[in-house]
Amino acid sequence: MPLAEAMLKREELMGMFESAGAIRHGHFELSSGLHSGMYVQCALVLQYPRFAEKLGQSLAALFGDLELDAVVSPAMGGLIIGQQVARALPEGKSLGDGPVGAGVPAIFVERDATGAMSMRRGFSLRAAQRVLVVEDVWTTGGSTREAMRVVEDAGGQVVAAGALIDRSGGAIKLGVTAKALLDLVIPSYPPKDCPLCAEGSAVVKPGSRFVRGAESSGSANARTSVGR
């Protein structure tokens, strides 16, 4: 299917996320450290291969006018969607040295023992390779910026960045072309200004069992705040 025909409509995208239970309500601490009453768990929609493929094709279609040599994603959230975007992109005249006919490579960067983002597992980029950085969700754009720095340190050239969801309200400024499939305006707060904290609601850190809340909050309250 041509990339231009792969673009999903907003209602189709929302339908996928909602049917997979990926849009959750409660009291959450995001990876940025901010708190929010809504969390989008992209892993829940990406666990379904046909959804992941369609989302990858649709996101790739936003960058169909660019010549790209590699897709780089920060682990863990960007792993699946990065692979699917790379799979959907035309191979073109790649500056890479991968196997002929293998397609655009999907590379991931991850945190090392010091907590710094790095390129490991034998991954590498050649000088001037044109890279698309792909993430699942943007809130502050911190992980994407870290991935961009790793690409540049490896000699690559970041030409664009993409995400499934931009929950920043368009505030993300990355210094390159940046596009998301869905723009969702979801309020988020520093912990000291969080109205949910002021109410004494327990906060959940998605992706882990770590729950932190008022001393009076029992395990039942903590479970409730995970949301629907």
Language-model features: locations:
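PRPP-associated nucleotide enzymes
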Residues: 1-228
